[in-house]
């Protein structure tokens, strides 16, 4: 029997907690209070979904209200553009300059207007923005040659990968 939308999607402002014992719906305040105690919180989205980005912004704002010492990491930016992110957060660049200098079109390419509200929030509150990615050439090289074939000096600061946890082959 197919699940109804009510069974799958919580009401706006609610979160679904999934565990071994099943699903439960939790209020935003309770979840935000718990998340604000964590060192790292990952907020995923479909890159082209405006609602997902709005949810991310609301979650970031709620976390910032509880934990102002916050930093935001972004998967789309290679580490080489970190100085641009720093300039943006410091209020030194226009949107156009930020998008051009971060090489937005080639490093990401999705509609920047989906992301700009989050970038503006970070800038408005002087929240550090962290470039988390590496250059595509490094990704392709590792795929082609393997991690061990890349000299440490050419790994863009990335350390040795951690071993897989026991449940994984």
Please annotate each region the language model reported.
Residues 38, 67, 125-126:
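Short, well-ordered alpha-helix to beta-strand connector turns
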Residues 83-169:
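A substrate-binding/cap region within the structured catalytic cores of diverse enzymes
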Residues 1-38:
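N- or domain-start disorder-to-order transition segments that initiate the globular core
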């Amino acid at each position: 029997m197919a699940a109804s939308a009510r069974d799958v999607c919580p009401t706006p402002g609610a979160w679904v907690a999934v565990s071994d014992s099943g699903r439960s719906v939790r209020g935003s305040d309770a979840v935000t209070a718990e998340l604000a105690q964590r060192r790292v919180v990952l907020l995923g989205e479909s890159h082209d979904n405006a609602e997902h980005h709005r949810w991310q912004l609301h979650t970031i704002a709620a976390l910032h209200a509880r934990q102002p010492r916050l930093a935001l990491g972004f998967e789309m930016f290679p580490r080489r553009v970190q100085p641009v992110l720093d300039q943006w957060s410091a209020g030194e660049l226009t949107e156009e300059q930020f998008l051009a200098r971060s090489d937005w079109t080639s490093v990401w390419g999705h509609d920047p207007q989906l992301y700009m509200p989050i970038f503006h929030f970070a800038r408005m509150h002087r929240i550090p923005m962290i470039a988390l990615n590496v250059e595509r050439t490094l990704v392709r090289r590792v795929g082609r040659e393997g991690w061990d074939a890349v000299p440490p000096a050419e790994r863009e600061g990335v350390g040795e990968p951690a071993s897989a946890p026991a449940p994984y082959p």
